[in-house]
Amino acid sequence: MTKPLRIGIVAGELSGDTLGEGFIKSVKAQYPNAEFVGIGGPKMIAQGCESLFDMEELAVMGLVEVLGRLPRLLKVKAELVRYFSQNPPDVFIGIDAPDFNLRLEKTLKDSGIKTVHYVSPSVWAWRPKRIFKIDAATDLVLAFLPFEKVFYDKYNVACEFIGHTLADAIPMQSDKIAARKLLGLELDRQWLAVLPGSRGGEVALIAKPFIETCQRIHQKHPNMGFVVAAVNEKRREQFEVIWKETAPELKFIIIQDTARNVMTAADSVLLASGTVALECMLIKRPMVVGYQVNKLTGWIAQKLSITEFVSLPNVLAGKELVQEFIQEECHPDFLYPAMEKVLSQDNSELIDRFTEMHQWIKKDADKQAANAVLRLINKETAE
């Protein structure tokens, strides 16, 4: 009997859990008995991944914040190295979480295990010299965006552009009315979606300026509805506390675990920079982006940055399509006028551009990723 394909895999946060889920499904479509073990969230676990640690262990935001968790992170890494050394997989996949996964990948690669990093770190945006560490740590990088492969090719680092899983998952035209019915929102009301981040550290810094921005919007648009996407119960409770402290008179409808549906149901979106900005672009909703981290983390990031933009719609376009306000500018004095502009202008040209970009990165990424990894480990891929 042939030994089953065995894949080590580590995802560090919610977006990585979703990528891992699709990757596992695509591999299992060709190798139903394939085994997956490492660190995953609920979606990966539901697909049969054995998670040795809680994924929350790795969900740490910012350079400064990581320092406080460093002893625990080092212990988790050591345990994973020990496990994979004793039980070598056919390949190891690190999904995002580069500060953790690249170190783990380097150790595993040095021990003779083939390694893949899924989701390119933003070497094209800041700390470009990281590409040499990536080269030393990996046998292959799987990149979502076309300009990332161009960057890797320049340095002769193995990389495949696989398209973006979100571009595959989200339809070219999203159904606003169906989403409102699904969420129980009034069909004929104007809705603003508020997404203050998926991590505790993000919500702690971003929720208040977002709520204060909504206060100002409410003064001019008293019939505007505000719907908040909370990724889990912890983030829901955290947002509620900040809401009651900041603007208890304002009404928010908080909906858990359905960020995509919340954005689809909305007319416009106020969101924290990250994967959700790309998702919002693919849903074709006009947006304003705000983001804030610890001041020292922000200062370091600014010094090391080599790109003009933070949000992916702007990076993809190579110009400002959506307004973004980072650090001190993530404040209602900036966010409100930008949001007011979105609410009052004709956004049809923006939506057309979003549609073009959607088509550009739609390539069946789950299958592309699985096939790239299977090629790496010399398995015959199905057509």
Curated annotation (Swiss-Prot):
Pathway: Bacterial outer membrane biogenesis; LPS lipid A biosynthesis. Belongs to the LpxB family. It comes from the Bacteria. Keywords: Glycosyltransferase, Lipid A biosynthesis, Lipid biosynthesis, Lipid metabolism, Transferase. Coiled coil: none annotated. The keyword Phosphoprotein does not apply. It holds the Pfam family LpxB. GO terms for cellular component: membrane. Disulfide bonds: none annotated. InterPro entries: Glyco_trans_19. GO terms for biological process: lipid A biosynthetic process. It comes from Aliivibrio salmonicida (strain LFI1238). This is Lipid-A-disaccharide synthase. The keyword Membrane does not apply. Its EC number is 2.4.1.182. PANTHER family: LIPID-A-DISACCHARIDE SYNTHASE (PTHR30372), LIPID-A-DISACCHARIDE SYNTHASE, MITOCHONDRIAL-RELATED (PTHR30372:SF4). It catalyses: a lipid X + a UDP-2-N,3-O-bis[(3R)-3-hydroxyacyl]-alpha-D-glucosamine = a lipid A disaccharide + UDP + H(+). It is an enzyme of class 2 (transferase). Condensation of UDP-2,3-diacylglucosamine and 2,3-diacylglucosamine-1-phosphate to form lipid A disaccharide, a precursor of lipid A, a phosphorylated glycolipid that anchors the lipopolysaccharide to the outer membrane of the cell. One of its GO terms (molecular function) is phospholipid binding.
